[in-house]
Amino acid sequence: MKIVKAEVFVTCPGRNFVTLKITTEDGITGLGDATLNGRELSVASYLQDHLCPQLIGRDAHRIEDIWQFFYKGAYWRRGPVTMSAISAVDMALWDIKAKAANMPLYQLLGGASREGVMVYCHTTGHSIDEALDDYARHQELGFKAIRVQCGIPGMKTTYGMSKGKGLAYEPATKGQWPEEQLWSTEKYLDFMPKLFDAVRNKFGFNEHLLHDMHHRLTPIEAARFGKSIEDYRMFWMEDPTPAENQECFRLIRQHTVTPIAVGEVFNSIWDCKQLIEEQLIDYIRTTLTHAGGITGMRRIADFASLYQVRTGSHGPSDLSPVCMAAALHFDLWVPNFGVQEYMGYSEQMLEVFPHNWTFDNGYMHPGDKPGLGIEFDEKLAAKYPYEPAYLPVARLEDGTLWNW
């Protein structure tokens, strides 16, 4: 089944998405997501100028061979741009293969391992009271796992805080320059346990409670924080410290039993190897769009299963609905599933990407349409051209550049 066309689309129905569409000689099409927030045009160029021409004439069924060709053939292996491009190709080819087999992707992968995919939502607020109101709203929607972030007294901005009450959190700022945010570790460490205490006192322990530290702490600060919140029985603390220094997670492990989730910025199994092998984390957060697609994620998940590490895939709305659809198929199948992040999408976004998934009482299902179960409206997408936007940077209160 030869590939006859490979096209790249960059569209901004509220935020930028990079979509790959592959067409075979039989007229079967497959979609892949290559979105890399703040660096979308780099990936689009990598696909358009380098990978797409080399797809023409290839057998779409030879997914593994194509994956290896683009990974090993590049010589400059790994990295977010290369791996996001490979991920999109892989995703689109699995979409084609499942459509050719006339079955949903999760069936082609080996069938469902569960009835539905537990997803976690994001709650936020400028104050504890606002965060509690947002928590209650998501609780009423049926979510069983809820991430809680909040504005911190004495800090004008912080990660995870929406720009207005009831609005979804949107980190990227449109324009040619990123927003600069200030950070105070001591204010954070003093305040955040008070937020968790308020949540548990009001809502109890019925829902899984999650929190994202977003790489802000040093190893010893992360250890101190994890120990201080053990009574609140967190589902996980996410990205407590930059994961480039993987050895430091031994120190964190020595001081706290709060579960740890890491990996949303990882691009391959090699990035995950030490943390998984030494059981320094409990959840691996790699995502289909950045870690090699279905093929790459299967390797990571299989390796993680040997060490009882579960998946908790990154899934914010700066990954397109194509990624979300693929992730739900993967999550429904993968044996060592933990949870899936789900921020949701605007009506405008879902008009460009008509989908087939469903949400019911805290669980999602990808649907049973052949392939990924998602479409792409090219004409509508063309009405939303690319708009420059960048993720923020963080500085300490004295002006020192810090980890955002």
Swiss-Prot record:
InterPro entries: D-mannonate_dehydratase-like, D-mannonate_dehydratase_GalD, DgoD-like, Enolase-like_C_sf, Enolase-like_N, Enolase_C-like, Mandel_Rmase/mucon_lact_enz_CS, Mandelate_racemase_C. Signal peptide: none annotated. Transmembrane segments: none annotated. One of its GO terms (biological process) is carbohydrate catabolic process. SUPFAM superfamilies: Enolase C-terminal domain-like, Enolase N-terminal domain-like. Induction: Repressed by RspR. GO terms for molecular function: hydro-lyase activity; magnesium ion binding; mannonate dehydratase activity. SMART domains: MR_MLE (SM00922). Belongs to the mandelate racemase/muconate lactonizing enzyme family. NCBIfam families: ManoateDhtManD (NF043051), PRK15072.1 (NF011654). Probably involved in the degradation of homoserine lactone (HSL) or of a metabolite of HSL that signals starvation. Overexpression prevents homoserine lactone-dependent synthesis of the sigma S factor (rpoS). This is Starvation-sensing protein RspA. It comes from Escherichia coli (strain K12). The gene is rspA.
